[in-house]
Amino acid sequence: MAKKIIRKAAKKLVAKKAVAKKAVARMPAKPAAAPKAGAHSTQHAVEQFLYRQAEILDGKHWQEYIDLFTADGVYWMPADPADKHWDGIPSIFAEDKNLMTVRMKRVLHPDAWSQRPLWGTNHVVGNVNIEKESANGDVVVRSRFHMMELRRDNVRHFAGRYVHQLKKTASGYRIKAQRVDMTNAQAAFDYVLQVWV
């Protein structure tokens, strides 16, 4: 008799535990930790900076784009995504502000017939993640991009990842370094890239 009562009680306990387990499974997930003070405004400011950069490039305002860089800023597109630094190794692009200015002047030179008509581009930037924020406001940001290029009825697509090192200044962010890891960097193309992705 006592054994029957104990078995019944044990079954009820197991059933109650199963019901409780199901109830817990249906509960909403625990909310994420509250962001640090100012995190939303930093995220928004960084996103707006990257979107503005895309608009500047698509508008062919290349001097304005170059001006987004710090005096010692670098634009780097490695040939190999495993590369850790740009100095002294083969790269698709590895340019400081001086070389960027030379590139812009060459493309816009009136005798650069091979570059006419100029191409059109359309950038989409997303998945913007602040990887690191320093006490002075400098940030390291990862994002994804897709660029469509139209030139003489030929359409090309480039996609990949940006890593920006942004320096906070009184007039907003400036680019200390921009790394561009293109997913299709090793693909065969009819002609080379002339300006920045």
Annotate each predicted stretch with a short phrase.
Residues 2-29, 33:
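Low-complexity, polybasic segments enriched for Lys interleaved with small residues
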Residues 29-71:
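Short, low-complexity N-terminal intrinsically disordered segments enriched in polar/charged residues
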Residues 38-41, 88, 154:
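Conserved aromatic-histidine-acidic binding/catalytic patches
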Residues 44-48, 91, 98, 157:
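A generic "alpha-helical surface" signal
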Residues 53-55, 111-118, 151-153:
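Short helix-to-loop capping/linker segments positioned immediately adjacent to catalytic or ligand/cofactor-binding
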Residues 71-141:
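A solvent-exposed, acidic/Ser-Thr-rich amphipathic alpha-helical stretch
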Residues 122, 129-197:
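A beta-strand edge to alpha-helix "cap/lid" segment located at domain peripheries
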